[in-house]
Amino acid sequence: ESLSSSCNEKITTIKNEKVSQIDSDNNIQVVTTNSSTHFGKIIVDSRSNIKQQEIKSPLIHQAFVGSEIELTKERFNPDEVTLMSFIKKENQIEFIYILPFTKKRALVETTVFSIEPDLKAIENTHKEILKTYEPYKEIRQEKAIIPMVVISPFGEKRILKIGIGGGMMRASSGYSMRRVANWAIKIGERRLSEDNISTFRHRSNKWLNYLDKIFLNVILKYPEKGPYLFMMLFRRAKMPPLIRFLSDKPSGADLINILLCMPKRLMLKGLAKKKND
C-alpha cells in the first residue's frame, strides 16, 4: 500500500505489453515494451529476470502442479498435512504435498526439484495421483516452474527490484511469501522516493544464504539424498527454531540447532563442492 501511495493518487494499469528494455536518460527511466515507451523517475521492477552475474549458487528449478479437489466421500484429515511424500526418481527430487481444508476438500500438489524439470511429465504423474481420489471435482489448478537460487541483485540507482528478481525467494525452498511479508512489514507506511530507494531494497540474511548454497550443492550433486536430508531436518530439529528458520527469522542459536540436526558428512560434501565452484 505504501508503494502504491508513493505513485501519486492516480495509477494507470497497462496490460498486454511485454517489457523488452529499461534504460536511463538524464535521471529519467525509459521502459521500452513491444508496443510503446513509458517514462518515470523510479521503476519498481517485479520481473523474475535474473542476470547471470547476480547468481551466487547452483541454479535448480522447482516445478509443481497442484489441484484443489473436492471428493464425494470423506478421505482427508483436516488436522494433518502431508508436507513431503517422496516418489523415487533418478536425478531429481519428487514429492507430493497434501493440504486438507475439510474431510472432503484439499490441495494436492506434485513437486519436482531438478536442473531441467519436465512439466508435462509432472502433469502426467499428477493425473495418476489424482486417480486414487476418484470420483472428485477439480476446483482449480496451479502450475509453474520457479528458480531455486541465491542471488545478489544489482542495486541500480533508480530501479527497485522486488519479488524473485529482488532476492525475495528462499533458495532452498522456492518459497517467497514469508520474505515478502517480512519486507512489507519492515517498510511499513514509508513513501518511496528517489532519496530513500536504497532503504526499500530487500537484504537477505547472509548466513541463511550460506546454508542455502550448501543445500543446493547437495541436492545438485546427490539428488537421491534429498529425502534423507529433509527427513533428518524435520525429525531432529526442535520445532520453535525450525519454524523461525523456515520463516526467515532465525537467531544465531537457531542456526546452530539446525546445523546440528543435518547429516554432517553430507553437508560437508556440499561445503566442499561449494568451495571448489
PLM region descriptions:
Residues K89, I93, K143-I162, A171, ...:
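FAD-binding beta-loop-beta segment adjacent to the flavin cofactor pocket
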Residues E1:
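Glycine-rich active-site loop/strand segments that organize a redox cofactor
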Residues T111-F113, Q141-A144, G165-G167, S172-Y175:
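Histidine- and/or cysteine-centered catalytic micro-motif in compact active-site loops
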Residues I98, K103-R105, G155-S173:
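Short FAD-binding loop at a beta-strand-to-alpha-helix junction that anchors the flavin cofactor
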Residues Q53-K56, I60, E156, S173-I187:
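A short alpha/beta connector and helix-capping loop motif
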Residues E116-E142, P153, K157-L160, N182-R203:
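Flavin-binding catalytic cores
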Residues S6-E138, M148-G155:
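Predominantly flavin-linked oxidoreductase catalytic cores and closely associated redox partners
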